[in-house]
Amino acid sequence: MANDDTTTRSPVRQPFLLYAAKGRIYARNRTQKVIDLGAITREDGGSFRYLLDGNQQSDGGFFTEEEALQAIARSVRFLWLDGQFTAVADARDDANLDLDGATRISIELDEMPPGERAVDATV
């Protein structure tokens, strides 16, 4: 009889792309939906700062937009980002959206393992 121990299964990883374009942070999921996550601005000293709309998370002092995106990638959780894709309108409907040539990074986030509680303290 096979052992059906679900606690040893690896979590499923979901791919996303994060973009910095025209002063905004965008995310794209595997279904190609694009959402606007918040602002990215250049401070007086030349460094970049971001502010996410959904949870007011912010940070600054980044030399490049890519560094800011990497910081977001390190702190964002799957449940929060997945919830944003449910709650926020598809930015592809905005005629002004242009991600060609935008700074971007690829990330993968772990979904919840089976049996784990669906609570995200970062929301």
Question: Model-found features: residue ranges?
Answer:
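Short aromatic-glycine-(Arg/Gly/Cys) micro-motifs in beta-strand/loop hairpins
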Residues: 32-57
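Short, exposed beta-strand/loop patches in secreted or surface proteins that constitute
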Residues: 15-19, 40-41
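Active-site beta-strand termini and strand-to-loop segments that position acidic
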Residues: 28-30
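A detector for short, charged/polar N-terminal pre-domain segments
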Residues: 7-17
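Short, hydrophobic/aromatic-rich segments at coil-to-beta transitions
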Residues: 19-26
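Mixed-charge, Lys/Arg-enriched low-complexity segments
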Residues: 3-8, 52-123
